[in-house]
């Protein structure tokens, strides 16, 4: 009995240490000399063998040197749906691949960073379960690489729960409305139809539909060469490729997105104001493109 209590105490203490730490945005999992296709296959297998489900993948900016793999798991989906303020946006986790010369760099978004940034109200009750999902994802990718070097900046749980880039910049709760439909079903039909047509040079990378909850999330590739990913990613940093794709969420009859000035800043928190000014039009361009998918 004493041994059990001691073990539980150690586990609890370890969790408290993790919860109190600053969370990096990304981990560099490792580097491979294999081809992009081969590395992507290894990542897929590693995640699927650990109970995760691959929901979509694509070449951001239509670049052969960039690749994003999106995945989820049933327990994550259930937790995400319990956060009614757009929590389903955190259902999709991402791995990024970037080809540099004769090697491929593998990175992943840190699940706990995303969870703290997106699950605003009531995360404490779900924290242990979310930590397990995060650790399972990292453990799965140990078959791919062993570095797990943090990069991209770091923030504390406290700051992530109320994150905004600067004074007068939006918070998570300041979602931008794209359109309102007569019903959830109509919204689903319109968005799907426009994505099938590739309207606005977009790509339907993944969709998660929870019809019983009247919630759907679409991961959308922004492939317009003038104002899409190929325009802004080279400026703010392609190493953060596990931030893509951008998302639309349909809840009930309303389609919304996270403001670009929030979502971009959250995934690139080390951006200087000078660099942000270089993509000043990007948040509006993204909104216009995604709004077009709802019309």
What are these regions (language model features)?
Residues 1-4:
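Positively charged n-region of N-terminal signal peptides that target proteins for export
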Residues 7-15:
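Bacterial N-terminal signal peptides
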Residues 30, 71, 81-85, 214-219:
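Compact, glycine-rich, soluble single-domain proteins
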Residues 65-108:
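Mid-chain, structured segments of secreted extracytoplasmic proteins
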Residues 95-115, 250-264:
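Beta-strand/loop substructures that line and gate deep hydrophobic ligand-binding cavities in soluble
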Residues 106-149:
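Hydrophobic alpha-helical segments and helix pairs
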Residues 206, 210-295:
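A cross-kingdom marker for long, charged
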């Amino acid at each position: 009995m004493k041994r059990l209590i001691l073990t539980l105490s150690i586990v609890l203490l370890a969790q408290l240490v993790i919860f109190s730490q600053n969370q990096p945005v990304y981990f560099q999992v490792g580097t491979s000399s294999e081809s992009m296709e081969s590395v992507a296959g290894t990542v897929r297998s590693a995640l699927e063998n650990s109970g995760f489900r691959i929901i979509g993948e694509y070449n951001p900016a239509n670049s052969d040197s960039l690749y994003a793999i999106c995945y989820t798991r049933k327990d994550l989906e259930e937790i995400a749906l319990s956060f009614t303020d757009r929590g389903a946006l955190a259902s999709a986790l991402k791995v990024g691949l970037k080809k540099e010369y004769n090697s491929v760099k593998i990175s992943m978004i840190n699940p706990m960073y995303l969870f703290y940034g997106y699950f605003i109200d009531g995360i404490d009750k779900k924290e242990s379960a979310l930590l397990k999902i995060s650790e399972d994802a990292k453990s799965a990718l140990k078959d791919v690489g062993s570095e797990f070097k943090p990069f991209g900046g770091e923030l504390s749980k406290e700051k992530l729960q109320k994150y905004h880039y600067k004074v007068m910049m939006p918070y998570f709760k300041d979602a931008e409305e794209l359109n309102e439909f007569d019903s959830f079903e109509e919204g689903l039909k319109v968005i799907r139809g426009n994505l099938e047509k590739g309207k606005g040079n977009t790509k339907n990378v993944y969709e998660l539909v929870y019809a019983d909850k009247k919630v759907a999330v679409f991961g959308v590739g922004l492939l317009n060469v003038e104002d899409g990913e190929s325009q802004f990613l080279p400026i703010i940093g392609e190493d953060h490729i596990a931030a893509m794709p951008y998302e639309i969420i349909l809840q009930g009859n309303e389609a919304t997105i996270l403001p670009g000035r929030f979502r971009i800043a959250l995934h690139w928190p080390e951006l200087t104001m000078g660099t942000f000014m270089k993509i000043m039009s990007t948040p509006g361009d993204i909104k216009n493109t995604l709004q077009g998918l709802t019309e």
